[in-house]
Amino acid sequence: ASFKKGNNLFSSTFSGIEFTFDHYITLFTDTPYMQWYLNTFILATANMLISLIVVTMTAYVFSRYRFRGKRNTLMSILVLQMFPAFLSMTAIYILLSKANLIDTYTGLLLVYVTGSLPFMTWLVKGYFDAIPTSLDEAAKIDGAGHLTIFIQIILPLAKPILVFVGLVSFTGPWMDFILPTLVLRSEDKMTLAIGIFSWIASNSAENYTLFAAGALLVAVPITLLFVFTQKHITTGLVSGAVKE
């Protein structure tokens, strides 16, 4: 439909359909689509990097350190996954409003990172637990500290689970509609989801094929990421979910 002339999604016949790139040209010339794309890419990349750092360090602490309350904290993390995210929407809005973080990427990133932290921490911890502690002990004999062990030993061995965490953290903001709608207000800060929705809504039912073109371009980066990282995704998810 995105390559078909006109504004109709469907055609009565397949013969005689004329293909065109006009809808894609219109996206980048007559709409702020490129700005929405850039906003979403920056937000998704920032969330991926921050989540990787926070999740891996937190999971390493739970996997390798012993401290009071560790078991109860892990159980609390697991229990938090039982509640739907929608239950916290009102509280999130009030907290961000009190902190003057409404209409900021900082507020949105805080929600994304903290929202995925419990599940990702539990998953990565399971993967770290499967890495023999004898490697840590051998490194300590050679004079390595916890930071050196974490960076030079644990992270290289945990590549599959890191790829999985990074991909999930990237696709979350890329595809999300609810949270950006709740937090963002300015047109120049819109993400792809709310940008396309607001633009199509303001133009009634006249641009379905243009919407199809925009939706197709949204799917391209995610599809490519899954194609090139699917081996690591499967390995990381299965290994992180199994406790030995």
Each predicted region: which residue ranges?
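A structural signal for multi-pass alpha-helical bundles of membrane permease subunits
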Residues: 1-244
